[in-house]
Amino acid sequence: MEAGTEVGKLARELFGKPVDVTETVNGQLNLPAMTDRTQVEIEHETSVICEASFSYQGCYCAVDILKRENDGWAIYEVKSSTVNEKNMKAVYVADVAYQKYVLEHCGVRITGTYIVSINNDYVYDGKLDLERLFQITDVSEFVRNEIGEVEKNLLQEDTLLESENEPERELDYTVKIHMDVRIGNIVQKNYQLRPYLTYIGCR
């Protein structure tokens, strides 16, 4: 976790001076405050927002780096490992597709989706070169193919969350990811935060 946090901080430096909207209360992430602050930064035309937070019908996500473009916004998902075709398709693209799904349902136009990962060919020569340490992969085509699966997975998760029984088979990894997020939302609700967050017209 610490290594991932440090990589995330370094990756942010590729984008100048972004605004981090992370908010906490009693040591826990304050999701309503984060979504509210994200809206404020968007209205203030902030160029780059870190941990940009959105919620749509109980689905919450925080984008590692959200960068303003001429006609919309680009999602940058930071990974502390290298990217290969297998993990990109099986795990990373699913994450980004979920984020795009939530943001677009919140009225945010997404014009690009990227994964920022470690370049395993980089050799440290005594001076850190972030441009060479990281590689940025455009995953727009993969996300476009994956986006249709998001809603199907959410329907499956709704069934599982409402059931009193354990699932009969092991969950697909993508479903596990989304379940963790949505169970986290339930915990947040019990933390006396607003049960349904709203953002740019989401209900």
Predicted regions and their residues:
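Short secondary-structure capping/junction motifs at helix and strand boundaries
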Residues: 20-21, 107-114, 156-168
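A broad, structural surface signal
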Residues: 9-13, 94-104, 148, 152-155, ...
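Alpha-helix initiation/capping motif
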Residues: 24-26, 30, 82, 89, ...
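Metal-dependent nuclease catalytic cores that hydrolyze phosphodiester bonds in DNA/RNA
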Residues: 1-72, 196-203
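Mg2+/Mn2+-dependent nuclease catalytic core
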Residues: 37-145
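Cys/His-rich finger/ribbon microdomains and the adjacent scaffold used
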Residues: 1, 7, 129-203
